[in-house]
């Protein structure tokens, strides 16, 4: 990538990672601390965690379409303002119901598709997988930092303070958006059945289903992996970053050669199939093995190599396949599929665990 493309990829990844850092910080603390809210029940705590994915899925397509019509930058600012409003609602309440409402607003700022469309608009086709991999790396860094920072902030200033911190991060993301060049709409089109048909070709639907399945596996897996760590006494909950941090770092080292082979030697299909095979192998090992620290770390690394490779390749394939004028809408459908996969994966994974046992969830993900 040239200097201009690298700068754009850096800014987009920074916006995405700052926003995702705010969201990820809730994961290790929400279920523990939310029981202190008024009217708190396990169901409402679950709603506070999961409703974000539902509203994200619902608003991805409208945001993608509107960005095709009015440009990417105005929609990015609008989405971050909505996200900020949701953070403020959640920060200024002692009632779990208003936390749920605040989280719903956070999800309503659905800018993921708009950001990826902006990146695709600004980076040449040959460099899109590299740019997507860079964005994925930054999100991975944000995830690892969140596992450490989230519990520290919450232990000092509570969940309310954490939501204020998340709101502050959304302001930081907005400042970065203001530094982006205005992206003018390529073409105006009416949101019609015909427009949707253009984004529902066999190739695009296959990519949508692929990202749905990928995030279904991720959500289902992360219901049980922390529990398996505790069950097998691999590390304490406070120290689980000792597994996640090296696994993510090693996985990015393993992912880079796969992306280079995919792009430089035009072997995208083979790398995609290899990554899917690695994904299946990781789920089989989780299902059948007696887990200790080393086995868990190696298996988790294989899982992240596969997941991150597929996560980088799919948006690149989508941007090549979708028509430029409908790219925002296509990215919206793609992101909707991703968030629906997360929500449904969490719901089904939790149901299987409730009815059967932990390992049965991996049996489910093997066949997905």
At which residue positions do the language-model features occur?
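Juxtamembrane intracellular "pre-TM" segments in multi-pass secondary transporters
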Residues: 1-5, 181-210
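Short amphipathic helix-loop junctions that connect adjacent transmembrane helices
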Residues: 28-43, 223-239
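Conserved MFS/SLC helix-loop-helix module at the cytosolic interface between two early adjacent transmembrane helices
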Residues: 58-94
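Helix-to-loop junctions at the C-terminal end of transmembrane segments
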Residues: 60-71, 254-267, 353
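Cytoplasmic membrane-interface "Motif A"-like loop-to-helix N-cap segments
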Residues: 69-79, 263-276
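Cytoplasmic helix-loop-helix junction between adjacent transmembrane helices
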Residues: 102-139
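C-terminal membrane-cytosol helix-exit motif in multi-pass small-molecule transporters
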Residues: 167-186
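C-terminal transmembrane helical hairpin of 12-TM major facilitator-type secondary transporters
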Residues: 269-314
């Amino acid at each position: 990538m040239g200097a201009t493309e690298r700068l754009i990829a850096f800014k987009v990844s920074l916006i995405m990672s700052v926003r995702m850092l705010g969201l990820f910080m809730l994961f290790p603390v929400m279920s523990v601390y939310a029981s202190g809210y008024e009217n708190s029940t396990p169901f409402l705590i679950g709603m506070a965690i999961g409703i974000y994915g539902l509203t994200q899925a619902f608003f991805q397509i409208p945001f993608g379409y509107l960005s095709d019509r009015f440009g990417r930058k105005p929609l990015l600012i609008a989405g971050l303002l909505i996200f900020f409003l949701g953070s403020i609602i959640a920060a200024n309440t002692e009632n779990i119901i208003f936390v749920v409402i605040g989280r719903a607003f956070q999800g309503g700022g659905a800018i993921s598709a708009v950001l990826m469309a902006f990146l695709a608009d600004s980076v040449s086709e040959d460099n899109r997988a590299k740019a997507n991999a860079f964005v994925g790396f930054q999100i991975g860094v944000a995830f690892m930092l969140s596992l450490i920072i989230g519990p520290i902030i919450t232990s000092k200033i509570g969940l309310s303070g954490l939501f204020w911190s998340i709101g502050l991060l959304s302001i930081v993301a907005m400042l970065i958006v203001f530094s982006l060049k205005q992206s003018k709409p390529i073409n105006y089109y009416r949101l019609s059945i015909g427009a949707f048909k253009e984004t529902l070709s066999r190739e695009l639907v296959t990519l949508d289903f692929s990202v749905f399945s990928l995030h279904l596996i991720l959500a289902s897996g992360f219901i049980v992996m922390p529990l398996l760590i505790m069950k097998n006494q691999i590390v304490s909950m406070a120290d689980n970053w000792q597994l996640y941090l090296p696994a993510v770092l090693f996985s990015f080292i393993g992912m880079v050669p796969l992306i280079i082979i995919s792009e430089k030697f035009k072997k995208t299909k083979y790398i995609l199939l290899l990554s899917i095979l690695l994904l299946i192998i990781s789920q089989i090992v989780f299902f059948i093995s007696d887990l200790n620290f080393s086995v868990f770390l190696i298996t988790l690394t294989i899982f992240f190599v596969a997941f991150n490779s597929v996560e980088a390749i799919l948006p690149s394939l989508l941007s090549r396949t979708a028509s430029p004028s409908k790219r925002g809408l296509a990215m919206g459908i793609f992101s909707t599929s991703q968030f629906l996969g997360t929500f449904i994966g969490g719901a089904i994974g939790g149901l299987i665990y409730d009815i059967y046992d932990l390992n049965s969830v991996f049996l489910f993900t093997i066949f997905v």
